[in-house]
Amino acid sequence: MTNIRKTHPLIKIINHSFIDLPAPSNISTWWNFGSLLGFCLVTQILTGLFLAMHYTSDTMTAFSSVTHICRDVNYGWLIRYMHANGASMFFICLFLHVGRGMYYGSYIYFETWNIGVILLFVVMATAFMGYVLPWGQMSFWGATVITNLLSAIPYIGTTLVEWIWGGFSVDKATLTRFFAFHFILPFIIAALAMIHLLFLHETGSNNPSGLISDSDKIPFHPYYTIKDILGVLLLILILMILVLFSPDFLGDPDNYTPANPLSTPPHIKPEWYFLFAYAILRSIPNKLGGVLALIFSILILMLFPLLHLSKQRSMMFRPLSQCMFWILVADLITLTWIGGQPVEYPYVIIGQFASILYFTIILLILPIISLIENKLLKW
């Protein structure tokens, strides 16, 4: 009798995706982040579901409902902080996952890569709307500032913003619709993640060398299932240290003040994972220019397959490109720091320089270095 794992229509799909999947024998820990992102998504959906059972999306009661969750609901504080810090872990894994793809040339599988970039956009939108829900000062003003950016769109901008707001300012209608979208989007993310995997399994995984690994494949289970479980345990450890010892470490103290449309916080800034994009937005004095730079700072990832001019796929054997890649990482860390600083000298100048460097490295320097490396190897 044939194993049910290989014959049952549904179990067969799971088998081909997670058990009998041929995987390269040399993929490193950098390949763990896909499974970690899956784990983060499941955790966020579950904690979010339990939070939604007690949350009310009304401007009068939203803030107090979050307080009620933390004070009166059994382990409500744990669920709330796991959800808030889980988002940070999600973005850490996302950035490392994208960075891995850039370093090892995974973007050559352009269908998988482009779905991944769309996923990044949707996750960022979801996180932004989630940040608005507690209805603290930073929630309200963050929503006001970011939605207001759409007014930079010529001709239809103002109408579009008022349509999104559901009125003439961020108010009850805005909060209610943001809650509705924040609830539905994670399920859309899950569907997109399945498409992401579908495209990946069409080609098979890349590996650190960037070479074709068809001649040396091993089954995903038990080798990489064990490896992924180790990664998940480490993620849980870091998340729980954060949640249990310093749950507000990555948050903003302003969000413990209920939203007040009459009082603007001294420094309006988003969560840490948006600061790099926020710094790019602020570094351009023109509103429309800033918005375009903000969108393009993420959309530029879609150009990576077109900008790949090297004869080698991975950066593993390309020291010049490696050096430039790490300068890009340092530049992004600088942008993240600048995004959290007030708009004054010298931060403005540093932000503008770092923003120019970000686009220059990706669009100009990396492709040129690739050509130089080809020349050095007489290719």
Curated annotation (Swiss-Prot):
An individual GO BP term: mitochondrial electron transport, ubiquinol to cytochrome c
Cofactor(s) annotated in UniProt: heme b
Localization: Mitochondrion inner membrane
Residues at which heme b b562 binds: 83, 182
Residues annotated for a ubiquinone binding in this entry: 201
Topological type in the membrane: Multi-pass membrane protein
Domain of life: Eukaryota
Coiled coil: none
Keyword Electron transport attached: yes
Database matches in Pfam families: Cytochrom_B_C, Cytochrome_B
GO molecular function, one term: ubiquinol-cytochrome-c reductase activity
Any one cellular-component term (Gene Ontology): respiratory chain complex III
Residues the record lists as binding heme b b566: 97, 196
Chain ranges passing through the membrane: 33-53, 77-98, 113-133, 178-198, 226-246, 288-308, 320-340, 347-367
InterPro entries: Cyt_b/b6_C, Cyt_b/b6_C_sf, Cyt_b/b6_N, Cytb/b6-like_sf, Cytochrome_b, Cytochrome_b_C_euk/bac, Cytochrome_b_N_euk/bac, Di-haem_cyt_TM
Record note on cofactor: Binds 2 heme b groups non-covalently.
Annotated keywords: Electron transport, Heme, Iron, Membrane, Metal-binding, Mitochondrion, Mitochondrion inner membrane, Respiratory chain, Transmembrane, Transmembrane helix, Transport, Ubiquinone
Described purpose of this protein according to its UniProt entry: Component of the ubiquinol-cytochrome c reductase complex (complex III or cytochrome b-c1 complex) that is part of the mitochondrial respiratory chain. The b-c1 complex mediates electron transfer from ubiquinol to cytochrome c. Contributes to the generation of a proton gradient across the mitochondrial membrane that is then used for ATP synthesis.
Leftover remarks: Heme 1 (or BL or b562) is low-potential and absorbs at about 562 nm, and heme 2 (or BH or b566) is high-potential and absorbs at about 566 nm.
Subunit structure as annotated in this protein's UniProt entry: The cytochrome bc1 complex contains 11 subunits: 3 respiratory subunits (MT-CYB, CYC1 and UQCRFS1), 2 core proteins (UQCRC1 and UQCRC2) and 6 low-molecular weight proteins (UQCRH/QCR6, UQCRB/QCR7, UQCRQ/QCR8, UQCR10/QCR9, UQCR11/QCR10 and a cleavage product of UQCRFS1). This cytochrome bc1 complex then forms a dimer.
PANTHER family in alphabetical order: CYTOCHROME B
Family: Belongs to the cytochrome b family.
Protein name per the record: Cytochrome b
Native source species: Marmota baibacina (Gray marmot)
